[in-house]
Amino acid sequence: MSGTKWTEEQLSAITTRDCNLLVAAAAGSGKTAVLVERIIKIITNEENPIDIDKLLVVTFTSAAAAEMRERIANAISKKLDETPTSKNLQKQLTLLNRSNIMTIHSFCLGVIKNNFHKIDLDPSFRICDQTEGILLKMEIIDELFDDKYDEENQEFIKFIEAFSSYKSDNALKELVLSLYNFTMAGPWPKKWLKDASRDFDIKTLQELDETKWVNVLKESIKIELDGYIKMMQKAVKLINETDGLEPYFEGFSSELDLIVNAYNNVESSLNDLYNSLNLITFNRLKTIKKNTVSDENIQNLVKQIRDQVKKKISALIEGTFIASPDKMLDNIIKSYPYINQLTELTSEFIDRFTAKKKEKNILDFNDLEHLCLKILIEENEENQIVPSTIAQKFKDYFEEVLVDEYQDSNNVQEAIIELVSRKNSDNPNVFMVGDVKQSIYKFRQAKPELFIDKYNSYSLDKGINRKIQLYKNFRSREEIINGVNYIFKSVMSKTVGELEYTDVEALNLGANYPEKKNDDDIIGGPIEVHILDRSDNKEENDEFKLQAEEEIGDVNLEARIIVKRINELISKKEGNKFKVLDKDTGEYRDLKYKDIVILLRATKNWSEVLLDELGLAGIPVYADTGSGYFESIEIRTIMSLLKVIDNPMQDVPMLSLLISPIIGLSAEELSDIRLIDKEKYFYENIIKISKEKLISVELQEKCEYILSSIDKWRRKSIYMPIDEFIWYLYMDTAYYGYVGAMPNGVLRQANLKILFQRARQFSDTSFKGLFNFINFINKLTKSSGDMGSAKILGENEDVIRIMSIHKSKGLEFPVVFLAGCGKNFNLMDLNNKILYHEELGLGPEYINLENRTSITTLPKEAIKKRMKLETLSEEMRVLYVAFTRAKEKLIITGAVRNAEKSIEKWINSAVLDKDVVLPYEISKGKSYLDWIGMALCKHKDGEILRKKLGFSSEMCKDDLSMWKISIWNKYELDMYDELDENQEEEDVKISILDKDVNKEIKSEVYRRLGYEYEFKESTKLTSNISVSDLKKRNIEDDIDTLKMFDLEEEDNKNKDIITPKFLQEEKGISAAERGTAIHFAMKKIDFSKVGTLKEIKEQLNKLYDEELILQEEYNSINPYKILSFFKSSLGKKMLYVYNEGGKVYREVPFYTEISSLEIDESLPQKYANEKIRLQGIIDCFFKCDDEIILLDYKTDYVENEEEFKDKYKNQLSYYSEAIFKMTGKKVDKKYLYSFYLEKEILI
């Protein structure tokens, strides 16, 4: 660290002492390095060193705390290398193990453990997991409502009638739980509830005028009227500058005066404001004769501006003043009993939940902060809340309190920091570092206002409260820096963004990117914006385009643009290659897939499509989703199965089950079942069909099978623990094997394992049974507890990552695609019946029980307006985070319904001010693309936007940023992408046919149904079969291997159910599992580090550390065997190809067609044209000395080498055929490598 060249501002942040110091550290400014160096300087100060355990360092995550410790340890160790006799350094390295570098929750837990007696807590308490916490809440909320019903309290009954649905009170229970979670983010939840209720206890208009709600409404109205005034002023200016528009001047000026008058009355009483707004009228414009106006475009523009203002003022009055002030007051008064009931229910829930946790001697994460707070405060003689003696000890002990990611703190955490530090004393000692422009956790109740208040009040000069700004970015190229500054100077403001983005906040270039050495190379370049126009081209409406419109969704089309640019960036042609800077060598190199990330605001509904489209194009890709687990097809299918077993009288899950591979009915069969009796449930109709031959014998037999299966599963569910029952279903239905054979099968099976593990956690609680488990999962699905898919990828895999912007925070990538920018912001929460806000309290609808009508209230409208601005501000910061992830290239994509209309809207917003887009216009934006488009309409590179509507370049402003804007018609994009025969990526994903895979297990299920018809021989054939199964001589051998799944032999099957690794006790893994583990290792291993046993062991350790292989799998892999392969002549040949820059293709999936007679020669000749889809995964192939060499790894026990060769001969033939279809080149040599024999075998 001592060799680092610090900037002047960084040095100030490192060395400034004896004050509260706020460091505003922009993206890429070296925040963490500065924080670590400050700590090092403090503990190694020659004159007054401070022990590291006397510092409290609060981090946002445990991972950040661990990284901080590691960095400090490395820094101390380096200093020890320089001065090995330093006793202080040796002492600090020792003290580091007990240092207070931790999350706020860890700190609170330590305070509680050391002071449990102060709060009457049993010291043997434990922290409950999420599962147990959710189940307890469900139990308590049910008990609470049951008790309230028993009391027959009329106010409660009216509350239920007003806010529950006709069928249940679940929505109201959810409301109480949601409000509980919200209030627990504040320091005094029960006080907040009391205050929120008391706010509704008003009687007069004067009292209403003094409320926070009215102030917020006035602020909002002021912003809107200011926008309308500027719009009308712009129109009047254009009228004055344009010959022939003089007749408009008087009317426009008069209307402008009325709006100004209303603006001036904003600070008056609600009644006066209401009246002044209603005085605004728009009379008929005077007529202008044709051909008398010098510029008709200007005439149309001013009329459009006036029409917009007219509509918006009408909407403002109707939306804000939903009634007269008197009537709004009346609605508030009538809503008071409802609000009182809600707050009392929530408060009682808090008490009951607290009592239940005390009874069980458990705490949850909310308790950690609140109990810590309870320990740190006490009442003095004047009944004032003051720091306790324990808090005072912390104040005296900690020499400095350092808070990382301060922009994400909430009010509880702020209170705790104040109580254990000397922040409010004459000897302050708090260091806070963060970037408010990256505060994107408001959904976790983060309070960026805490940072903003200090940023606005702290001084740059000397004083006890100081701030230092770090705005030099050491991450990104100049093109990225300039682009970020241009966009956010244009659109970020105090109104939307909660911070003005001025030259002070702008990023400054700090990274040093060298010039390119080869003129043909491509580096950096302008930021790209690709706009997909979804409108129809009426002049071109042929059959091909209609088909494209029907078959390709908007997300797919946007994905095609991304695929096209990726293929262009990672070009297979010589010359003109896109290069990125290698951070290790300092030289430019070819772009790799792992250098690219695709960022999404939310991955749901997008990541699957992107995976499919990139996969079809042969681009290796992985989606790192933070959610969507419960939306995956395999989890939805199993949950539908569980719901049907619990209660078959549910049509939605029943339908999902019937069409799933578990049952596999056709659309026609489903229709036949439904038409038996449309008024009955599917289950009832299935019963009816099973008893009578109403359709066909086949359907009757299927219905009998469905009923017998459901009956069997229901009986099993009664006595089996839920986790064992779920695994039983996986095996009994063969669904676990089925999803493993689907695309992304490893991930799908991992997802099913997660569900099993979740069921095991559930079994460890006091709640039992299928019904409770389904309810628990439903709660998780509705809450923010969606867990994201299983992790199956290492960080160094050469694949493109797809992730949410939130997941990307703190990361950086050479090339960033920011996709889905045309998607509308999610403002659905603003439509809830009751809104709540930390400052403004509760905002309900008023429900009139007499006529069953609802109407919004003034509190709700006030909260709605504030929440909308806060949500948009959060979105602005999320966009900033996305932009600043890019190091060298940023590519933005987004779709609009109609490009011309969108551009017209952007230009109309942009023309109102030369330098920025007005905050009012930004607040009306519905997507990131709206904001970006408004800004780019004013940029010199936005000519393509202005030209589309005939606008001149006079509105342009000079700027250093460079942009390349493209507008795509949806018909320009090819429907299908062909695989290039010279494709260079290592992990090729090929789909010769479609990707719909039905496996042999499904065929076996149908076989057991006992069909008897003309082509019954073909029932032995699957529509798909894997190559590994073709090593059998005929299909009957395959059927024997599937006996373990026999649905009719229930008793025997229980003995044969495969027990997963995580259910086994003291047992090793199977030979097949061992083989899978070795194959996985051979796919993941880095060929550049296989020269020694140590290197191979290190790579296997890494796979285990990254949780890519389980403990049992890790133990089963013999590193000596892998080293032996690389020492063999075949292994050396492969390494030679790799080291010379050739491509070694590993784990290549494929699908192709073969004749059914190749599967079973005994079939009649009439099946010669019957095709079977063949799928498999080729272990490895590569080109060496103009020969294509195929290699297949085997881990079998080998007794006879010739029999071993004969066993796999056909399998390698199919692989060879697949390689020919992919590359157009024949395989010259086919090898088996036996890890058992440690020998290569030529076939």
UniProtKB/Swiss-Prot annotation:
> Which biological process annotations from GO are given for this protein?
double-strand break repair via homologous recombination
Gene Ontology cellular component annotations, sorted alphabetically: cytosol; DNA helicase complex
Give the matching SUPFAM superfamilies: P-loop containing nucleoside triphosphate hydrolases (SSF52540), Restriction endonuclease-like (SSF52980)
Q: Give the UvrD-like helicase C-terminal domain ranges.
A: 512-810
Q: What is its EC number?
A: 3.1.-.-, 5.6.2.4
The cofactor named in the record is: Mg(2+)
Q: One GO molecular-function annotation for this sequence?
A: ATP hydrolysis activity
Instruction: Write down a Pfam family by its short name.
Output: PDDEXK_1
UniProt keywords (A-Z) are:
ATP-binding, DNA damage, DNA repair, DNA-binding, Exonuclease, Helicase, Hydrolase, Isomerase, Nuclease, Nucleotide-binding
The reactions it catalyses are: Couples ATP hydrolysis with the unwinding of duplex DNA by translocating in the 3'-5' direction; ATP + H2O = ADP + phosphate + H(+)
Q: Which residues bind ATP?
A: 25-32
Q: Which Gene3D superfamilies match?
A: 3.90.320.10, P-loop containing nucleotide triphosphate hydrolases
Residues in domain UvrD-like helicase ATP-binding? 4-477
The UniProt family comment states: Belongs to the helicase family. AddA subfamily.
Any idea what job this protein has? The heterodimer acts as both an ATP-dependent DNA helicase and an ATP-dependent, dual-direction single-stranded exonuclease. Recognizes the chi site generating a DNA molecule suitable for the initiation of homologous recombination. The AddA nuclease domain is required for chi fragment generation; this subunit has the helicase and 3' -> 5' nuclease activities.
Q: Subunit details for this protein?
A: Heterodimer of AddA and AddB/RexB.
Protein name as catalogued? ATP-dependent helicase/nuclease subunit A
Q: Which gene encodes it?
A: addA
